[in-house]
């Protein structure tokens, strides 16, 4: 007997039996220890053999443990030597003889089990007493191996390789576990056509992620099950190869190749009845490749070329080009079947087809408007993924959200129960008091508590009844699903009596019951129908784009948007109106979907409110004045700096980091983008903007298309400022627009200007405007001081003084800020530090005799 002729699993079993003996303080290793070790092996081979021979592994393992406990324990200080018994050596020798007699080069674990069944020791008796004879084991081994010989050290890995490393898709179709496949007839027909060829009958499905490549295979499996395929494929089974299971645990060199060869061998023996499906086909290229070893694709090539292997691959366009096309010999053995993204109409049909499966899983109902919304809204707003996958995800998440809400207590009932708890706590505290007021309060609260508890009981009963109704509906739908699967099976097996009973008796009866429960009073506490607004709400959460149904308060807010913006931007009514109209168009849903929500060029002198209006707009839309993407164009004066916006080109530092502009918009597609001081940038930068303004998209350095259709783009410039500054007070800006545009046309190309929604001129601020701005600035200071509990007051003379002294037509409102810092904030800072102004005091600002006075009132 040569121990080197035992397989790795057999050696492991022998080693483990030594550990079992040591653990139990036994001095000898007996066949019983070896049997216990075999029962612990993890390949599942022993369990299969025991089951096929009419035994039960769990019962046998318990009996072995009982016998192990009967063996006397010998405890030796410092540990003693454990000897192999003569019986054990006889069993191993018999296993070696059995292997040789059956033409095996290596002794496997099943031969050791067979050798134990011949044994007259306790181990052998346990097997025979449970009806597991050597003859039965020999027959089970033959059935398991299917005539294969053990000629490698890891021979056990090749048994039932397809079952171990594959998933039977046709079996899933038979048991009704696959979703129905709608459409894709052309792709399935082309796949069947390639599979029916004599040579190179291997289609590869190529398409973007999420377009339904795997679904086509499931559709083909369903057609094979229903015999809706040519005769050549009627008896075929589709087995999906599990690459993870194939690679996992392949420790030794050549073990992976051995497993793959075992899979291919079983497919070859099936005489064309097994079609191998390899999802993510590109993983085969290079898998298992080590020094001197072949990768998986090279093992497949001979069988693929000869037509001995029916194989369907699936991969994406990028990975097909990157991995498979580079290996021309591998690529030519496959016939590409291109799977395009379905249209919105096709997606709606697909969603209608799988609707029942999702309703059954989540125990909710899906309205048709939700299906249409999922297809149309996902196509419009989720641009970095593909239909139908992104639409199915929306439906799934909306159903999941509703299911969670259904299982939770309704908000109305929850508030009621919380109020009851609050009153009970209040009553417990009041009962300790004895005064008259407390007694009256107790009476009042007791009456309120009785009323609330009665309402809570009624509402809880109603809620429980509604939950029971929904659970009843769910059970009926599950029954209907099972009945339909049984009907398909009965029709396939030509069991006409059962088919007619199901078709004309059981199924109509269940459908009638479902209809009755659905038609019952639906105005309850629980909402169980997924609607269009639920889908819109999910998209809003994913993208940040507010497309869910507007509340009446938001509608009113949008109608008075100009007033809100005028609170912080003074004297620029024309600009405010243009921006407000753009926002209202987008929220009303009548905006051109292929362009940004609005694109504006703000022209005017410094300090008149160009940047301030952009901040006010961000504050209105997002409740955060800083929620804008501000790009200072003075940083892009050199030509090479332009690439920072879309990312560095390949080969340059920072290529993998993405662009400043594109990455920010990808992460937050709904925002205000401000290109400040745009005339200072290099002229070539406007070539990038042409695509954004016209098509609402831009491709970054890595080839990813970024969607700008939900952004508001604002460009500010000081071009023509001297004309606007010298304009007469109160004169309409349109009178000088032509003069300003001459300056603008000298800097910007006509194709750029033509793509802007509006070019807005900001006129210079007058004395009245400055007065209003002073008030806003002092209100801001008042808010800052209130945080320190200091009250700031100011009168009209102070406002007039600051407005008059801070007014400069050439510089707008900016000198005003410096004046307030100099005249008020500097003096206040000194007073606070000196302790003159402290918490609770009032600071009053007034003006007397052309001088600003700061008074402190206790």
Curated annotation (Swiss-Prot):
UniProt source species: Rickettsia bellii (strain RML369-C)
Give the UniProt record's GO annotations in the biological process aspect: cellular response to heat; protein refolding
Annotated spans, Linker: 342-544
Q: Where is this region: NBD1?
A: 160-341
Protein name per Swiss-Prot or TrEMBL: Chaperone protein ClpB
Q: Name the keywords, alphabetized.
A: ATP-binding, Chaperone, Coiled coil, Cytoplasm, Nucleotide-binding, Repeat, Stress response
Q: Is Nucleotide-binding given among the entry's keywords?
A: yes
Q: Name one Pfam family in it.
A: AAA_2
Domain comment in the entry: The Clp repeat (R) domain probably functions as a substrate-discriminating domain, recruiting aggregated proteins to the ClpB hexamer and/or stabilizing bound proteins. The NBD2 domain is responsible for oligomerization, whereas the NBD1 domain stabilizes the hexamer probably in an ATP-dependent manner. The movement of the coiled-coil domain is essential for ClpB ability to rescue proteins from an aggregated state, probably by pulling apart large aggregated proteins, which are bound between the coiled-coils motifs of adjacent ClpB subunits in the functional hexamer.
Amino acids binding ATP 2:
604-611
Subunit (UniProt): Homohexamer. The oligomerization is ATP-dependent.
- Cite the residue spans of the region called C-terminal: 765-858
Location of the region described as NBD2 in the Swiss-Prot/TrEMBL record: 554-764
* Domain Clp R: residue ranges: 3-147
Record's GO cellular component terms = cytoplasm
**Which portions of this protein are annotated as coiled-coil regions?**
392-523
Q: Where is this region: Repeat 1?
A: 6-71
Family in the record:
Belongs to the ClpA/ClpB family.
Any one Gene Ontology molecular-function term assigned to this protein's record: ATP hydrolysis activity
Is Repeat one of the keywords UniProt gives this record?
A: yes
Q: State the function annotated in the UniProt record.
A: Part of a stress-induced multi-chaperone system, it is involved in the recovery of the cell from heat-induced damage, in cooperation with DnaK, DnaJ and GrpE. Acts before DnaK, in the processing of protein aggregates. Protein binding stimulates the ATPase activity; ATP hydrolysis unfolds the denatured protein aggregates, which probably helps expose new hydrophobic binding sites on the surface of ClpB-bound aggregates, contributing to the solubilization and refolding of denatured protein aggregates by DnaK.
Cell compartments where the protein resides: Cytoplasm
Sequence segments annotated as region (Repeat 2):
84-147
> What main location does UniProt list?
cytoplasm
């Amino acid at each position: 007997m040569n121990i080197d002729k035992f397989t790795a699993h057999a050696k492991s079993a022998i080693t483990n039996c030594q550990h079992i003996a040591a653990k139990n303080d036994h001095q000898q290793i007996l066949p019983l220890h070896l049997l216990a070790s075999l029962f612990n092996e993890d390949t599942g081979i022993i369990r299969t053999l025991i089951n096929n021979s009419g035994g039960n592994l769990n019962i046998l393992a318990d009996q072995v443990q009982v016998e192990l406990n009967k063996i006397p324990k010998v405890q030796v200080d410092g540990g003693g030597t454990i000897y192999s018994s003569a019986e054990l050596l006889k069993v191993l020798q018999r296993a070696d003889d059995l292997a040789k007699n059956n033409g095996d080069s290596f002794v496997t674990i099943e031969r050791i089990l067979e050798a134990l069944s011949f044994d007259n020791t306790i181990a052998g008796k346990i097997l025979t007493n449970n009806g597991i004879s050597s003859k039965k084991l020999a027959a089970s081994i033959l059935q398991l191996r299917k005539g294969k010989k053990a000629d490698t050290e890891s021979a056990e890995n090749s048994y039932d390789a397809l079952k171990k490393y594959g998933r039977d898709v046709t079996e899933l179709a038979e048991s009704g576990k696959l979703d129905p496949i709608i459409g894709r007839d052309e792709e399935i027909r082309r796949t069947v056509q390639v599979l029916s060829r004599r040579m190179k009958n291997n289609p590869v499905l190529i398409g973007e992620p999420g377009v339904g490549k795997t679904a086509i295979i499931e559709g083909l499996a369903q057609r094979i099950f229903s015999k809706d395929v040519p005769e050549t494929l009627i008896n075929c089974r589709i087995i999906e190869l599990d690459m993870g299971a194939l690679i996992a645990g392949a420790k030794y060199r050549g073990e992976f190749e051995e497993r793959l060869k075992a899979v291919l061998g079983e497919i070859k023996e099936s005489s064309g009845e097994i079609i191998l499906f390899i999802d993510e086909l590109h993983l085969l290229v290079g898998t298992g490749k080590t020094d001197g070893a072949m990768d998986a694709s090279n093992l497949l090539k001979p069988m693929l070329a000869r037509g001995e292997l029916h194989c369907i691959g699936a991969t994406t366009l990028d990975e097909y080009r990157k991995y498979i096309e580079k290996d021309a010999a591998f690529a030519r053995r496959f016939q590409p079947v291109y799977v395009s993204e379905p249209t919105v109409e096709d997606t709606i049909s697909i969603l209608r087809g799988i609707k029942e499966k999702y309703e059954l899983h989540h125990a909710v109902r899906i309205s048709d408007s939700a299906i249409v919304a999922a297809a149309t809204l996902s196509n419009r707003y989720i641009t970095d993924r593909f239909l139908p996958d992104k639409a199915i995800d929306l439906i799934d998440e909306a159903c999941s959200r509703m299911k969670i809400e259904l299982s939770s207590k309704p908000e109305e009932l929850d508030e009621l129960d919380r109020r009851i708890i609050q009153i009970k706590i209040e009553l417990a505290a009041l009962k300790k008091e004895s005064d008259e007021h407390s007694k009256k309060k107790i009476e009042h609260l007791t009456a309120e508590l009785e009323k609330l508890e009665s309402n809570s009981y009624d509402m809880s009963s109603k809620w429980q009844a509604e939950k029971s109704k929904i659970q009843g509906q769910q059970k009926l739908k599950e029954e209907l699903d099972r009945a339909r699967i049984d009907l398909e099976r009965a029709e396939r097996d030509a069991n006409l009596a059962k088919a007619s009973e199901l078709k004309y008796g059981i199924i109509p009866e269940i459908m009638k019951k479902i209809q009755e429960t659905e038609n019952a009073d639906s105005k309850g506490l629980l909402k169980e129908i997924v609607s269009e607004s639920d889908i819109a709400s999910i998209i809003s959460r994913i993208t940040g784009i507010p497309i869910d149904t507007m509340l009446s308060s938001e509608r009113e807010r949008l109608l008075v948007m100009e007033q809100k913006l005028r609170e912080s931007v003074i004297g620029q009514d024309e600009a405010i109106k243009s921006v407000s109209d753009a926002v209202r168009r987008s929220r009303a849903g009548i905006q051109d979907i292929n362009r940004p929500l609005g694109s504006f060029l703000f022209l005017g002198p410094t300090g008149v409110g160009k940047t301030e209006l952009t901040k006010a707009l961000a504050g209105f839309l997002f409740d955060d004045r800083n929620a804008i993407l501000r790009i200072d164009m003075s940083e892009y004066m050199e030509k090479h700096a332009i690439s920072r916006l879309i990312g560095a080109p390949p080969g340059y530092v920072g290529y993998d980091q993405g662009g400043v502009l594109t990455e920010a918009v990808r992460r937050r597609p709904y925002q205000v983008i401000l290109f400040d001081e745009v005339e200072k940038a290099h002229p070539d930068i406007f070539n990038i903007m042409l695509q954004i303004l016209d098509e609402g998209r831009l491709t970054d350095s890595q080839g990813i298309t970024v969607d700008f259709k939900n952004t508001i783009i604002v460009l500010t410039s000081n071009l023509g400022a001297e004309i606007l500054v010298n304009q007469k007070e109160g004169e309409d800006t349109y009178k000088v627009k032509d003069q300003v545009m001459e300056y603008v046309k000298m800097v910007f190309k006509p194709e750029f200007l033509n793509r802007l929604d509006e070019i807005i001129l900001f006129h210079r601020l007058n004395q009245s405007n400055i007065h209003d701005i002073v008030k806003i600035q002092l209100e801001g200071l008042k808010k800052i001081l209130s945080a320190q509990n200091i009250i700031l007051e100011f009168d009209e003379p102070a406002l007039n003084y600051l407005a008059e002294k801070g007014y400069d037509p050439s510089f707008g409102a900016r000198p005003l800020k410096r004046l307030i810092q100099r005249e008020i904030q500097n003096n206040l800072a000194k007073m606070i530090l000196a302790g003159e102004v402290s918490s609770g005091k009032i600071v009053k600002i007034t003006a007397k005799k052309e001088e600003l006075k700061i008074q402190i009132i206790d």
